[in-house]
């Protein structure tokens, strides 16, 4: 088929097609930097709240760290004070124990020193010839006087009503002359020391 026939039938001639050239708009070239500057600040507007929140959290954390450090310092101060008080208490306790021991030793030494003359008199009474009752009685009176000055007092028994806090009943005996519960005889004298019973009196009680 000839070209003329193809033209008549509306066909375009075969062959390589031409690319259409796109013409760029006329004007000055576009600067990328100016485009970025003139772009709407959408990205910065989105990150601003996040940065602000981050700053607030950091400030809160810093404040919490300061408060925690203050609490730790206060705790350490209390612990140091407690350790000092404990050490002072322990030292005071030891001093009091030493002082109490010293007082006990001094009191015992003083009592023994006062009893030595009584011991000497007993030795002399045993060496004496004849009846020694008077010498022993005098020695007993001397010993009683020394002990009474230290706080020793005898417990009243005969004729008293039985008191279990200071009396020990070793026997009960019917009696028409005494009321029930009355002490009618003392087997062994009891003593009080500074107002406290150190040995109960052993007695016979009427029933």
UniProtKB/Swiss-Prot annotation:
Domain of life of the native organism: Bacteria
GO molecular function, one term: unfolded protein binding
Stretch list, region Disordered: 1-60
Record-given protein name: Protein GrpE
A GO CC term attached to the entry: cytoplasm
InterPro entries found in the cross-reference section: GrpE, GrpE_coiled_coil, GrpE_head
Chain's role: Participates actively in the response to hyperosmotic and heat shock by preventing the aggregation of stress-denatured proteins, in association with DnaK and GrpE. It is the nucleotide exchange factor for DnaK and may function as a thermosensor. Unfolded proteins bind initially to DnaJ; upon interaction with the DnaJ-bound protein, DnaK hydrolyzes its bound ATP, resulting in the formation of a stable complex. GrpE releases ADP from DnaK; ATP binding to DnaK triggers the release of the substrate protein, thus completing the reaction cycle.
Keywords attached to this entry: Chaperone, Cytoplasm, Stress response
Compositional bias ranges of the Low complexity kind: 32-47
Gene behind this protein: grpE
Keyword Hydrolase: no
Stretches assigned to coiled coil: none
Organism of origin: Rubrobacter xylanophilus (strain DSM 9941 / JCM 11954 / NBRC 16129 / PRD-1)
């Amino acid at each position: 088929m000839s070209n003329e026939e193809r033209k008549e039938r509306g066909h375009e001639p075969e062959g390589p097609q031409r690319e259409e050239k796109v013409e760029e708009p006329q004007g000055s070239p576009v600067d990328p930097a100016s485009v970025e500057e003139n772009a709407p600040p959408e990205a910065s507007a989105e990150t601003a709240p996040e940065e602000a929140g981050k700053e607030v959290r950091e400030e809160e954390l810093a404040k919490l760290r300061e408060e925690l450090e203050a609490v730790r310092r206060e705790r350490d101060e209390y612990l140091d004070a407690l350790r000092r008080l404990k050490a002072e208490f322990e030292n005071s306790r030891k001093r009091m124990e030493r002082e109490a021991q010293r007082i006990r030793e001094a009191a015992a030494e003083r009592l023994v020193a006062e009893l030595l003359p009584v011991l000497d008199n007993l030795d002399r009474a045993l060496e004496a010839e004849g009846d020694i009752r008077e010498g022993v009685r005098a020695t007993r009176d001397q010993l009683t006087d020394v002990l009474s000055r230290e706080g020793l007092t005898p417990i009243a028994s005969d004729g008293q009503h039985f008191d279990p806090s200071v009396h020990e009943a070793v026997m009960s005996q019917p009696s028409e002359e005494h009321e029930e519960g009355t002490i009618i005889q003392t087997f062994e004298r009891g003593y009080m020391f500074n107002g406290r019973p150190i040995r109960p009196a052993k007695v016979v009680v009427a029933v």
